[in-house]
UniProtKB/Swiss-Prot annotation:
BP GO terms, sorted: fatty acid biosynthetic process; lipid A biosynthetic process
Name this polypeptide is given: 3-hydroxyacyl-[acyl-carrier-protein] dehydratase FabZ
Primary location group: cytoplasm
Species whose genome carries this gene: Burkholderia thailandensis (strain ATCC 700388 / DSM 13276 / CCUG 48851 / CIP 106301 / E264)
Active site per UniProt: H59
Listed SUPFAM superfamilies: Thioesterase/thiol ester dehydrase-isomerase
Amino acid sequence: MRRTIMSTEKINFDIHKILTLLPHRYPILLVDRVLELEPHKSIKALKNVTVNEPFFTGHFPKRPVMPGVLIIEALAQAAALLTFAEAEPKDPENTLYYFVGIDNARFKRVVEPGDQLILNVTFERYIRGIWKFKAVAEVDGKVAAEAELMCTVKTADAAP
């Protein structure tokens, strides 16, 4: 049975709430705060990008740039939070959110230390256990990356 944890009012999560919903931890937790959430519809989240991120050591030492795949991962984590806001997992520590597909990914600008990456994810549809989302990452109001994401939720013991 699904248990709704949200109402239709404007909702935001701090890092403590995020840590109860996502299994990710440092260095791969890529959402710092949920700024807005409308259950069944959309989420707006934030990733503060700092020079202390471990990936900047090698990407690239003279001109640090956040890897595009990690921008997409941040968007997927925001999508997971949108999904879990609709129906909180019965056993959060045993629930995994798998990224199962990506279409039409585009990278439009670099993301550098000091940027605030705004993660906008909109629910598109749910069919046969697959959630589909439209996702856009922005810095200073300009699109940094966009993609269509597909994800599924499984318990750890049922995972492939």
